[in-house]
């Protein structure tokens, strides 16, 4: 990364960082896409089981990844402030947190989750598939969190192409393992939907291996000496990471868990509806890679410029990100509307299920416009290290507004589609409130910068 002066130079740097991130996110989300489609091709029960299992793993995955992503703005600001020597200790303390979280999650999976599954309104077969799917994921949980830290370290330096290479190398391996474990090919056991969990868990370890190799072979990464001895546990650094990471993780948890809660509530409408909801939701997840990548890019660039005390440049990047996200939202909405029948055909050959998926995809258009406003704002706030309020707003918007609205509408003629209208309502409310917040934060940072200049 480097300082830019003109809007043209800023657009170029924005796209240089954004493009590899979006390719990475699309490739990562394709893992979920292939888990869903390949399980659906095995059976509707397998698809429903993966949907329930994913409803447990997805919010935990996203929330703890969000917590660990706290090192991205921390390192970006350190680089902007030319304090590179502090980067190694930040990464190491992030790894300590990652391993602790992995241990806790594995315990919860084996001690708590089975009991929850037995009390859910799904068949015993679907619950069993979900349980074995999660057991497979557990194989790779430590690796997943380690790779999250390493990815955040790499991205915070603006070297997003390296992360892209890591992902492009490993996801085809995941698809191959799905083919082996789900359908029992090449002498592997036929595990149905649960097999996708084991394939994903094993793939996470390959991600770590490739990450370590690239960090050790790339000069711009190797110079930080990440793997040259361990640094001491520093509670001040742990506190900083947690202080930013917990609100950030909660924000993501409240958003992803609301979708998981809706998946569980869909159980009242039957296995077919769960399968259709999960199929349409996986498409939305894939498309969400674009606004999410805008947010990640703004976190990196905003953090870098804020660390260098160039708030005007950080604000200009936010405007660029907003313009990009709105354009992307319009394109995604058009794709969902005009190609919904083709998209549904990827998931099933069952006409009734295909029709349900197409109906969900129409309502998914609302998500695209809400995310176009919300994601850039969240990315900018993370770059500014202002994340405490976002978690509160997320809880109110999603759980106290979005879910009740959706629940109420589900008893009308809208049925299960009412939940998706409720979800969209929550996203729009959060986008409105946080758009006000980001402007106030920028005003505060501007005053602080001026005061620092006067005192110096």
Curated annotation (Swiss-Prot):
GO terms for biological process: monoatomic ion transport. It comes from the Bacteria. The chain crosses the membrane at residues 13-34, 54-76, 95-117, 132-154, 161-183, 193-215, 244-266, 286-308, 321-343, 358-380, 387-409, 414-436. Keywords: Antiport, Cell membrane, Ion transport, Membrane, Transmembrane, Transmembrane helix, Transport. GO terms for molecular function: antiporter activity; xenobiotic transmembrane transporter activity. It is a multi-pass membrane protein. One of its GO terms (cellular component) is plasma membrane. It is found in: Cell membrane. Multidrug efflux pump. Belongs to the multi antimicrobial extrusion (MATE) (TC 2.A.66.1) family. This is Probable multidrug resistance protein NorM. It comes from Listeria monocytogenes serotype 4b (strain F2365). The lineage of its organism: Bacteria, Bacillati, Bacillota, Bacilli, Bacillales.
């Amino acid at each position: 990364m480097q300082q830019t002066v003109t809007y043209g130079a800023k657009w170029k740097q924005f796209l240089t960082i954004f493009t590899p991130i979006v390719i990475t996110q699309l490739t990562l989300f394709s893992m979920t896409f292939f888990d869903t489609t390949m399980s659906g091709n095995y059976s509707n029960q397998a698809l429903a089981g993966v949907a329930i299992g994913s409803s447990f793993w997805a919010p935990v995955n996203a929330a703890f990844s969000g917590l660990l992503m706290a090192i991205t703005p921390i390192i970006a600001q350190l680089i902007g402030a030319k304090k590179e020597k502090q980067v190694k200790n930040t990464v190491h303390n992030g790894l300590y947190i990652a391993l602790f979280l992995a241990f806790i999650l594995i315990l919860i999976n084996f001690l708590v989750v089975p009991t929850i599954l037995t009390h859910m309104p799904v068949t015993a077969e679907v619950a069993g598939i979900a349980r074995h799917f999660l057991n497979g994921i557990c194989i790779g949980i430590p690796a997943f969190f380690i790779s999250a830290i390493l990815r955040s370290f790499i991205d915070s330096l603006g070297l997003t192409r390296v992360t892209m290479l890591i992902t492009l190398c490993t996801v085809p391996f995941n698809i191959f393992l799905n083919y082996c474990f789900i359908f029992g090919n090449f002498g592997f056991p036929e595990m149905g939907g649960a097999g996708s969990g084991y394939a994903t868990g094993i793939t996470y370890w390959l991600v770590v291996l490739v990450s370590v190799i690239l960090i050790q072979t790339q000069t711009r990464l190797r110079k930080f000496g990440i793997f040259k001895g361990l640094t001491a546990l520093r509670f001040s650094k742990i506190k900083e990471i947690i202080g930013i990471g917990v609100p950030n993780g909660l924000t993501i948890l409240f958003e992803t868990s609301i979708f998981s809660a809706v998946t569980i509530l869909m159980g009242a409408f039957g296995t077919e509806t769960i399968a259709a909801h999960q199929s349409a939701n996986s498409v939305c997840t894939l498309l969400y890679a674009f606004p999410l990548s805008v947010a990640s890019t703004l976190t990196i660039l905003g953090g870098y410029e804020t660390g260098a005390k160039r708030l005007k440049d950080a604000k200009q990047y936010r405007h660029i990100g907003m313009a990009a996200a709105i354009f992307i939202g319009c394109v995604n909405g058009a794709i969902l509307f005009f190609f919904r029948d083709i998209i549904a055909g990827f998931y099933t050959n069952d006409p009734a299920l295909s029709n349900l998926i197409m109906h969900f995809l129409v309502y998914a258009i609302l998500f695209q416009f809400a995310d176009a406003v919300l994601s850039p704002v969240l990315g900018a706030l993370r770059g500014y290290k202002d994340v405490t309020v976002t978690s509160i707003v997320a809880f109110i918007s999603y759980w106290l507004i979005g879910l009740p609205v959706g629940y109420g509408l589900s008893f009308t003629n809208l049925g299960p589609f009412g939940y998706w209208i409720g979800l969209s309502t929550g996203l729009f409310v959060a986008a409105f409130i946080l758009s006000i917040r980001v402007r106030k934060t920028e005003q505060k940072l501007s005053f602080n910068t001026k005061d620092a200049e006067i005192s110096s």
